[in-house]
Amino acid sequence: MAGGKGKSSGGKSSGGKTSGEGPKKQQSHSARAGLQFPCGRVKRFLKQNTQNKMRVGAKAAVYVTAVLEYLTAEVLELAGNAAKDLKVKRITPRHLQLAIRGDEELDTLIRATIAFGGVLPHINRALLLKVEQKKKNKQIEA
């Protein structure tokens, strides 16, 4: 025993279970949480944008990242469906506009103006009734 308590193994202690494998590969916070968006970058932005040098926990950054990823996936899925309905393969700002304004919850959440998004197609019911009445009158006369 060379100057210390315990066993003298001559090297680093095992510190737990020993397996035949080498050291574990490093995993990012995003990989551990099963996310595609970068947790480290979101944490950095949270730290930069807080007042009075507040601390930001790692779990808070993971949670915010998960929420951002979910909302992005939801919007892209709806926009992809809108693009597919119009038989095109590229999502444009118009498709994003149709997707967001077509979903009631996303519409209340995202109140921003989307550049080149256009307007939603809408015809007042009073105008539709007049057109339908004219068609009926033509059918009766014929």
Swiss-Prot record:
Sequence ranges of Gly residues compositional bias: 1-19
Annotated Gene Ontology cellular component terms: nucleosome; nucleus
Sorted UniProt keywords: Acetylation, Chromosome, DNA-binding, Nucleosome core, Nucleus
GO molecular function: DNA binding; protein heterodimerization activity; structural constituent of chromatin
Annotated spans, Disordered: 1-35
The record's account of how the chain is modified after translation: Acetylated once deposited into chromatin.
Domain of life from the UniProt record: Eukaryota
Self-association state and partner proteins as the record states: The nucleosome is a histone octamer containing two molecules each of H2A, H2B, H3 and H4 assembled in one H3-H4 heterotetramer and two H2A-H2B heterodimers. The octamer wraps approximately 147 bp of DNA. H2A or its variant H2A.Z forms a heterodimer with H2B. H2A.Z associates with the VPS72/SWC2 subunit of the SWR1 chromatin remodeling complex. Also interacts with RBP1/DNA-directed RNA polymerase II largest subunit.
Function text: Variant histone H2A which can replace H2A in some nucleosomes. Nucleosomes wrap and compact DNA into chromatin, limiting DNA accessibility to the cellular machineries which require DNA as a template. Histones thereby play a central role in transcription regulation, DNA repair, DNA replication and chromosomal stability. DNA accessibility is regulated via a complex set of post-translational modifications of histones, also called histone code, and nucleosome remodeling.
Protein name: Histone H2A.Z
UniProt source species: Pyricularia oryzae (strain 70-15 / ATCC MYA-4617 / FGSC 8958)
